[in-house]
Every structure is written in structure tokens, then in C-alpha cells.
Amino acid sequence: MLPVSLYGASGTELDNFFSVLPTLVENAYDDRPYQETLFAITGNDAIKHITIADSWDHQTPFDWPEDLLMEVGMAVQTIKYPDVGLLEHLMTLDNVDCRRLFIWMHFETNVYPIYTKEACRGLDKLGLPTPYDPNDIATYGLYVQRIEGLKLHAPAEGMPEIGLPRARILQLGLERY
């Protein structure tokens, strides 16, 4: 039985996706910069974690006043997966969109998926229209629902055990599908 977030998906395409997923991501564990970033996130210093994630993503470092640093840090530490709406106000900061914001959250929590145009295209191929609009948190929320539905629907043999977050495995698999 399909989770509600996957209604409309092609059963054949889903089966095909999960049958090839292990092959699509077999080299994913070899991404040293990603791994080093993932394992560099320790402790509770959300601002330090954001800086590490931004470095991985080749973003210009932020220069925020102390009060804004505290607000961002509290927001990042307070939100619980799969919630996304509570972070929408952070998108008013210069050069912060859904993509950048949820790269922070991916590394902070290991569960939020990284938002990419290519992964949204992969979902489209599965019969799950998922727009990519980094300026609209609602489209990212839909993306999270789709990824979560895939996690729930995945057959045991379809999700390889390679030491990476399942959200990352699915994101990379969708990009390469």
C-alpha cells in the first residue's frame, strides 16, 4: 500500500527505481567532502554547524549581528522533522533560500533532504510532480513529504546500507535516475 504522499506515482516506476537504487548510489560513500562535513557536525553549536555546511556548499560566509545569530541558532535547534514552516522567516535573510536553509538542516539533523532540481526531476519521472522553487518553502515541504513517502515505501533490499542518511541516499538516487 502506498503512503498518501506517493499517490499518483507509477507503481512500475517505483519498483524500477528501488531495483536500481543500490547501483545508482554505490559510489555515494566515496564522496569525502560530504562525509567529512557530515561527521564534522558535533555538539550543539548550530552556528558553527551552519558555517561548516556553508563551506561544503561553497557559500559566502555570513556576517550577522549577535542577535540575529542567536535567532538563527535557536530556530535551527528548535524545529523538528518533518516540519519546515517554522524556518520560513529565515528566508528573509540575504542569500538564504530553501536550498541553502535545508542544507544547513540536513547536516544539523541528518534527516532533512537536500533540495535539488535534479531530485525533483527524478520524482517527476516516478509520476510525482514536485516543483523546484528554492524561494517557496511550500514546494520544499512537498519535496520532504515525497522523500518521506519513499522511505516508508522502500523495500528492504531497495535501500542500501552504506552509512549515509536515507534522505541523502534517496536524493542522490533521484538525481541519477
Go through the PLM ranges and name each one:
Residues 1-54, 116-177:
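C-terminal accessory module of base-excision DNA glycosylases/AP lyases that mediates lesion recognition
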Residues 17-18, 29, 39, 62-64, ...:
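Phenylalanine-focused residue identity feature
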Residues 71-74, 99, 103, 131:
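Generic preference for well-ordered secondary structure
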Residues 24-25, 75-79, 109-110:
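A short, ordered amphipathic alpha-helix with a cationic face
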Residues 85-126:
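Catalytic DNA-binding helix-loop module of base-excision-repair DNA glycosylases/AP lyases
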Residues 47-94:
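Helix-hairpin-helix/helix-loop-helix acidic hairpins
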